Design a protein with these regions (language model features):
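Active-site gating/metal-coordination segments in enzymes
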Residues: 64-65, 71-157, 161-164
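Mid-to-C-terminal alpha-helical segments outside catalytic/metal-binding sites
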Residues: 3-60, 65, 229-234, 242-276
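Conserved, mostly hydrophobic/aromatic
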Residues: 58, 108, 142, 186, ...
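Catalytic pocket-lining loop regions of alpha/beta-barrel enzymes
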Residues: 115-116, 128-234
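Active-site environment of divalent metal-dependent phosphoester hydrolases
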Residues: 3-5, 73-76, 97-100, 124-125, ...
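A structural motif corresponding to the C-terminal end of an alpha-helix
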Residues: 56-64, 84, 144-145, 176-180
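Histidine-centered catalytic micro-motifs
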Residues: 1-4, 150-152
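Alpha-helical packing segments of well-folded alpha/beta enzyme cores
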Residues: 50-57, 73, 104, 134, ...
Length: 276
């Protein structure tokens, strides 16, 4: 997970969440809604070419490819897809509150070649729980197109209700849609032990480490990767939303993964899942 900034002020990235924010810090003081957790929001500065700037940041840390949230109204995303398909591939953020969202997935798949679908159940307004039937057309389309579904689970960072993202809700989705490739993102805390138990239970359930610096990777996830979950856990960053690549990779070597876990964690698991 990575973003291509389009300007130094990225507050517009979070406008979709404004109807849910009630405290004054979140509404008017934070650069991003979970800033109380992220003390050093990356400063990207101003650049004539933010795509090239992002590629340079990737090259510093030998990142060959990155998954970007796609928006067809963004000229930067369109140009990245057109001119740098070797470096960027795309997920489509979706919202069941939008009419015909499942067909929108198909259109983006056919037109832009998206590789995945993503969602933030607690962040949409109205909120929609992971197991709500309103998601079913989207899940069905993901199965039809064989697109992985990346979903925020666990307590959300922003000060908004957590109920739609309780990890226990994933159980029903994986039971009802056994062919759906479901990837938990943004922590699954405090239910990481349950997340691991569900990954043992369901062959198409995975976990990515998005929005967490390596020193805060949950111990349950590290233990699972080192044992029965070697093919289930995959790296994801959070640049430039909340973490710099410098911070992420300065801490990475301290993660106690076994030697055989590293290549799968850093690339092989994602490459297989996303058919890269």
């Amino acid at each position: 997970m990575l973003g291509i900034p389009e300007q130094e002020d990225r507050s517009d990235w979070y406008k979709f969440m404004e109807p849910l924010l009630r405290d004054e810090e979140s509404k008017s003081m934070f650069k991003m809604p979970a800033q109380y957790m992220f003390k050093d929001i990356p400063e990207t500065g101003s650049h004539d070419d933010f795509i090239q700037y992002t590629i340079e940041q990737m090259d510093k840390f030998h990142i060959n490819q990155a998954m970007i949230g796609f928006h067809e109204k963004s000229d930067v995303k369109i140009q990245a897809a057109k001119n740098h398909s070797d470096r960027f591939f795309f997920d489509l953020p979706v919202n069941p509150n939008i009419e015909n969202e499942a067909e929108n997935i198909k259109r983006h798949y056919e037109t832009f070649g998206i590789k995945a679908v993503s969602a933030f159940p607690s962040g949409m307004y109205p909120q929609i729980a992971i197991n709500d039937p309103k998601w079913h057309p989207i899940y069905e389309m993901c199965v039809e197109l064989d697109l992985p579904f990346f979903c925020c689970v666990g307590v959300p960072g922003p000060r908004i209700p957590m109920a739609p993202q309780k990890v226990e809700l994933v159980d029903e989705v994986c039971w009802y849609f056994p062919e759906l490739k479901f990837v938990m993102r943004h922590g699954a805390e405090p239910w990481t032990a349950l997340a691991c138990k569900l990954m043992l239970k369901y062959p198409n359930l995975y976990y990515s480490t998005s929005a967490f610096s390596p020193k805060h990777y949950p111990q349950d996830i590290i233990n699972f990767a080192n044992t029965r979950g070697i093919n289930k856990i995959m790296y994801a960053g959070y640049f430039p939303m909340g973490l710099s690549l410098d911070k992420i990779f300065a801490e990475m070597d301290s993660v106690p993964f076994k030697d055989e876990v590293w290549p799968k964690f850093l690339g092989e698991n994602a490459q297989k899942l996303l058919k890269l």
